[in-house]
């Protein structure tokens, strides 16, 4: 069973930044599914100082190499001329009788 407790947070010094806060000043976030996650001050400070927050993502080197390869491929290819797509104009009805037939 989950428990709820209020932890007041003073945001007077950072009033220019719009955090998701409740009326009592508690910081929270929501997931795409609509679950509300409430963060207390101690947990946020622990997350900021955790070793995981100070390490880069493991796939960062792969992403960087992939982006570099794309840039190299773009610079070595010859530019091709493209023609704009042609569209056929639809004939406009001559009057409203064609659009709304009355019986």
From Swiss-Prot:
Positions of the UniProt region annotated as Disordered: 49-103
Domain of life: Eukaryota
Gene Ontology biological process terms from the UniProt entry: negative regulation of translational initiation
Biased composition (Low complexity): 76-92
GO molecular function: eukaryotic initiation factor 4E binding
Keyword Translocase belongs to the record: no
One term under GO cellular component: cytoplasm
Pfam families given in the database record: eIF_4EBP
InterPro entries, per database record: EIF4EBP (IPR008606)
Keywords: Protein synthesis inhibitor, Translation regulation
Family, as annotated: Belongs to the eIF4E-binding protein family.
PANTHER family found in the cross-reference section: EUKARYOTIC TRANSLATION INITIATION FACTOR 4E-BINDING PROTEIN (PTHR12669:SF12)
Protein's job: Regulates assembly of the eIF4F complex.
Name by which UniProt lists this protein: Eukaryotic translation initiation factor 4E-1A-binding protein homolog
The organism of origin for this protein: Dictyostelium discoideum
Lineage of the organism: Eukaryota, Amoebozoa, Evosea, Eumycetozoa, Dictyostelia
């Amino acid at each position: 069973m989950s428990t709820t407790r209020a932890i007041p947070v003073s945001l007077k010094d950072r009033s220019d930044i719009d955090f998701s806060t409740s009326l009592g000043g508690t910081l929270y976030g929501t997931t795409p599914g609509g679950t509300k996650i409430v963060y207390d001050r101690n947990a946020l400070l622990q997350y900021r100082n955790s070793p995981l927050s100070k390490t880069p993502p493991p796939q960062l080197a792969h992403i960087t190499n992939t982006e570099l390869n794309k840039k190299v491929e773009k610079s070595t290819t010859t530019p091709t001329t493209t023609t704009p797509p042609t569209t056929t104009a639809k004939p406009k009805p001559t009057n409203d009788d064609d659009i709304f037939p009355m019986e």
